[in-house]
Amino acid sequence: MTNIRKTHPLLKIINSSFVDLPAPSSLSSWWNFGSLLGVCLAVQILTGLFLAMHYTSDTATAFNSVTHICRDVNYGWLLRYLHANGASMFFICLYLHVGRGLYYGSYTYSETWNVGILLLFAVMATAFMGYVLPWGQMYFWGATVITNLLSAIPYIGTDLVQWIWGGFSVDKATLTRFFAFHFLLPFIVAALVMVHLLFLHETGSNNPTGIPSDPDMIPFHPYYTIKDILGFLIMLTALSALVLSSPDLLGDPDNYIPANPLNTPPHIKPEWYFLFAYAILRSIPNKLGGVLALVMSILILAIVPILHMSKQRSMMFRPLSQCLFWLLVAVLFTLTWIGGQPVEHPYIIIGQTASVLYFLIILVLMPATSIMENYLLKW
């Protein structure tokens, strides 16, 4: 008798995606982050759903409703901190996932890569809107500064900002619509994840060597299911340790002060996972130029497949490109650090240097190094 998982209309889709899926035998732990992101999304949707049951999206009560969740709701503090730190874990996995794609040349699957970039933008938008909801001091001013950047768009900028705000400043209308979109977007993200997986399963997975692995495939279950479960355990242990021992480690103390439009914090900054882009934005003195650089810092990923000049797909056997890749990682860490510092000497010049290096490495140095490596290998 044929197994039901291979004949049932629904089960055979799950079977071909997670059980009998042929996978390269050489996948390292860097391929775990896709499934970890799935777990992060599930955790965020579940904790967010329960938080939404007690949260009120009104400027007068939003801050107090979050306090009520933490103090009066059963395990409300756990839900709140799992959701807040789960977002940080989400972005850690997301950046490692993108980094792995850059290192091993996964971007040559252009459809999967482009849907991934859309996902990155959608998750960033979701995180930004969720960031505003507790209505703390830094949340409020962060929302004001970031949304105000849209006023740099010529001709329609000011109208666009007021349209998003629902008035002449970040107020009740803004909070209500941000809550509505923050609730909706994760489900759009989940749908995009399905499209991402659909395109991935059309081509099959890349592998660390970057060479076709068709002759050497193994079934996804049990080999990679066990490997993924180990990844889940490690990530959930790290998340639990963060939530139960230092839940405010990655947050800002100003957010324990209710939002006050009459009192500006000395240094406005977003959450740590946006600091690299924020540093690039601040490093350009012109407002429109800064906004364009901010968008390009993420959108530049879309032209990485076009800039791939190497005859080899992966960086595994390209030591010069490896050096540049790790220099890029160092530049990103530097930008993240600078984004959290005040706008003064020497941070301004360090930020500008790191921003120039970021674009220079991706647009010029990496393609040039790839061409040189081809020449050295006489290809």
Curated annotation (Swiss-Prot):
Bilayer topology term: Multi-pass membrane protein
Residues involved in a ubiquinone binding: H201
GO terms for biological process, alphabetical: mitochondrial electron transport, ubiquinol to cytochrome c
Cofactor: heme b
Transmembrane segments: 33-53, 77-98, 113-133, 178-198, 226-246, 288-308, 320-340, 347-367
Keywords, alphabetical: Electron transport, Heme, Iron, Membrane, Metal-binding, Mitochondrion, Mitochondrion inner membrane, Respiratory chain, Transmembrane, Transmembrane helix, Transport, Ubiquinone
Predominant subcellular localization, coarse grouping: mitochondrion
Gene Ontology cellular-component annotations: mitochondrial inner membrane; respiratory chain complex III
Cofactor info, note text: Binds 2 heme b groups non-covalently.
Entry-linked InterPro entries: Cyt_b/b6_C (IPR005798), Cyt_b/b6_C_sf (IPR036150), Cyt_b/b6_N (IPR005797), Cytb/b6-like_sf (IPR027387), Cytochrome_b (IPR030689), Cytochrome_b_C_euk/bac (IPR048260), Cytochrome_b_N_euk/bac (IPR048259), Di-haem_cyt_TM (IPR016174)
Residues of the signal peptide: none
Any one GO molecular function term: metal ion binding
Cellular compartment(s): Mitochondrion inner membrane
Residues that, per the record, bind heme b b566: H97, H196
Entries under PANTHER family matching the protein: CYTOCHROME B
Family stated for the protein in its record: Belongs to the cytochrome b family.
Assembly with partners or alone: The cytochrome bc1 complex contains 11 subunits: 3 respiratory subunits (MT-CYB, CYC1 and UQCRFS1), 2 core proteins (UQCRC1 and UQCRC2) and 6 low-molecular weight proteins (UQCRH/QCR6, UQCRB/QCR7, UQCRQ/QCR8, UQCR10/QCR9, UQCR11/QCR10 and a cleavage product of UQCRFS1). This cytochrome bc1 complex then forms a dimer.
Function: Component of the ubiquinol-cytochrome c reductase complex (complex III or cytochrome b-c1 complex) that is part of the mitochondrial respiratory chain. The b-c1 complex mediates electron transfer from ubiquinol to cytochrome c. Contributes to the generation of a proton gradient across the mitochondrial membrane that is then used for ATP synthesis.
Protein name, as recorded: Cytochrome b
Gene expressing this chain: MT-CYB
